[in-house]
Amino acid sequence: MTQTLPAGLTATATVAASSANLGPGFDSLGLALSLYDEIVVETVDSGLTVTVEGEGAGQVALDSSHLVVRAIEAGLRATGCIAPGLVVRCRNDIPHSRGLGSSAAAVVGGLAAANGLVSQTDWTPLTVEQLIQLSSAFEGHPDNAAAAVLGGAVVTWTDGAGAQARYAAAPLRVHPDIHLFPAIPQQRSSTAETRVLLPDTVSHTDARFNLSRAALLVVALTERPDLLMAATEDVLHQPQRAAAMPASAEFLRVLRGCGVAAVLSGAGPAVIALSTEPVLPAEAVEFGIANGFTIAEMAVGDGVRWSTGVAAGR
């Protein structure tokens, strides 16, 4: 049985950017950042209206193919509801195609907005586990999606493949001494474009190297930030992507040469530095700025939030 939502319901969702992989944790580790998109949705009698402010304005589709719309509709279907019409307003601060989880934020935010609508009916909203499952299915991997749902850092895993894949995540508490410095370039790059650069198979030697570093990174993030340099080493994906983003690769070299644990954020080209110092070395900052990177400290991001009505704003 399906319930048709009445016109006049409104909901707001706020969802964080995220950085995936964190070096060795390919498709497994994620970290939410304090940079947020906001989605406001209203049910109407018919039709679809989509508006976008900020990142992506004038570039993304404003019809039913919009990722937020698709996620809202998927969330409603999963709860047994439909909306005869929608007005969707997106206010985006998360840069697109930079490796900061903008697509995961769109999906998680859309699902959360659907929850905000459903919570005003007698039907049951999606659980956290369902949010992780549905958003990860959209993405094809759970690292960004789970970080956006739960906030903080996450370890994620996948059972099965294809349509049968099941996704799950466990949260990590990031050590308070760790400072996060995303560095965002003007260059864009999609995950699909850079994923084709990766080999289909890897050696046991390389697999063993990354397994040890990924396990160590969990310790470094939560208990021993002094281990971050060793814990963020990677041989499985960053070297293979370097030729496609030379400025990012060189910036990583400069940062790590200054003793800063720095990695590609997701598939890049953004870079994120994790440091126990409150500022980055001047040499590294000067290099980044000269090469078109915008560098700013961010806090660990919160998990997705939704509410009924239109929020007062960030």
Swiss-Prot record:
Substrates-to-products reaction catalysed: L-homoserine + ATP = O-phospho-L-homoserine + ADP + H(+)
Q: Where in the cell is it found?
A: Cytoplasm
Q: Which UniProt keywords apply?
A: Amino-acid biosynthesis, ATP-binding, Cytoplasm, Kinase, Nucleotide-binding, Threonine biosynthesis, Transferase
Going by the record, the broad EC class of this enzyme is transferase
Q: Mind telling me which GO cellular component terms the entry cites? A: cytoplasm
Domain of life, source organism: Bacteria
SUPFAM superfamilies, per the entry: GHMP Kinase, C-terminal domain, Ribosomal protein S5 domain 2-like
One example of the protein's molecular function in GO is:
ATP binding
Pathway where this protein functions: Amino-acid biosynthesis; L-threonine biosynthesis; L-threonine from L-aspartate: step 4/5
Which one GO biological process term can you cite for this protein?
threonine biosynthetic process
The record's Pfam families line, in alphabetical order, gives: GHMP_kinases_C (PF08544), GHMP_kinases_N (PF00288)
What Enzyme Commission number(s) apply to this enzyme? 2.7.1.39
Q: What is its main location?
A: cytoplasm
Q: Where does ATP bind?
A: 95-105
Family matches, as InterPro entries: GHMP_kinase_C_dom (IPR013750), GHMP_kinase_C_sf (IPR036554), GHMP_kinase_N_dom (IPR006204), GHMP_knse_ATP-bd_CS (IPR006203), Homoserine_kinase (IPR000870), Ribosomal_Su5_D2-typ_SF (IPR020568), Ribsml_uS5_D2-typ_fold_subgr (IPR014721)
| GTP-binding found in the keyword field | no
- Of which family is this protein a member? Belongs to the GHMP kinase family. Homoserine kinase subfamily.
What the protein does comes down to:
Catalyzes the ATP-dependent phosphorylation of L-homoserine to L-homoserine phosphate.
PANTHER family, sorted? HOMOSERINE KINASE, HOMOSERINE/4-DIPHOSPHOCYTIDYL-2-C-METHYL-D-ERYTHRITOL KINASE
- What is the official name of this protein in its record? Homoserine kinase
Species whose genome carries this gene: Mycobacterium sp. (strain KMS)
